[in-house]
Amino acid sequence: MEPSTNKPDCKKIFDSIASKYDRTNTILSLGMHHFWNRSLIQILGSGYSLLDLCAGTGKVAKRYIAAHPQASVTLVDFSSAMLDIAKQHLPQGSCSFIHSDINQLPLENHSYPLAAMAYGLRNLSDPHKALQEISRVLMPSGKLGILELTPPKKTHPTYSAHKLYLRAVVPWIGKSVSKDPDAYSYLSKSIQQLPKDHDLEDLFSKSGFYIAKKKKLFLGAATIWLLEKQ
């Protein structure tokens, strides 16, 4: 994944759909994103502190605190509108919020044992730089859990149906529920344009990580990678 020079203004997109984001996601994923988020938390394991990147409205953070009540979570997102929603339903004592781009995290070196990024990889303007920055703030042997929506391979039986769903159904639901068809048209395209597995594996390696675990979910519609800092 090379730095993108023609990626739309993702911050503007997510600010515009923030108020309807959770409801629309539930409809689009048929509620499966709740299971996917839970799987990410299970794969990450326990830790006293979690860095939640592309944190959005805080659903991953909320689930992590429920599973690990003694832990603290730092939520980072470039959309202030998304973080404002997260602040409304997360315990302030356990959570802190940072409005920032991942490419330049205002955090000390080696300061977190665990990090999570759900549905954010395909929206990064410079994935290599972002992953290097995450590696910088992770402790030695720190872990990063990435959850992303992924297109099935062309040889997979669900490929045609999945492609039709992304091209036709996702923008239509986005228009009906969020009233912002352009935003969900972009989100649909970003899933279809996600690099192939071997390209992602190469990206992770060049950014200072190795894949400790990989899990496909719901016929390959989503994938979790557990990366460990080299």
UniProtKB/Swiss-Prot annotation:
Signal sequence coordinates: none
Pathway: Quinol/quinone metabolism; menaquinone biosynthesis; menaquinol from 1,4-dihydroxy-2-naphthoate: step 2/2
Residues binding S-adenosyl-L-methionine: T57, D77, D101, I102
Keywords in alphabetical order: Menaquinone biosynthesis, Methyltransferase, S-adenosyl-L-methionine, Transferase
A Pfam entry, by short name: Ubie_methyltran
MF (Gene Ontology): demethylmenaquinone methyltransferase activity
Gene Ontology biological process terms in this record: menaquinone biosynthetic process; methylation
Keyword Lipid biosynthesis: no
Superkingdom field: Bacteria
Ranges in coiled-coil conformation: none
InterPro entries the record matches: SAM-dependent_MTases_sf, UbiE/COQ5_MeTrFase, UbiE/COQ5_MeTrFase_CS
Keyword presence, Transferase: yes
Broad EC category: transferase
Catalytic reaction equation(s): a 2-demethylmenaquinol + S-adenosyl-L-methionine = a menaquinol + S-adenosyl-L-homocysteine + H(+)
EC numbers, comma separated: 2.1.1.163
Functional summary from the UniProt entry: Methyltransferase required for the conversion of demethylmenaquinol (DMKH2) to menaquinol (MKH2).
Family assignment from sequence similarity: Belongs to the class I-like SAM-binding methyltransferase superfamily. MenG/UbiE family.
Protein name stated in the entry: Demethylmenaquinone methyltransferase
Lineage of source species: Bacteria, Pseudomonadati, Chlamydiota, Chlamydiia, Chlamydiales
Gene (name only): menG
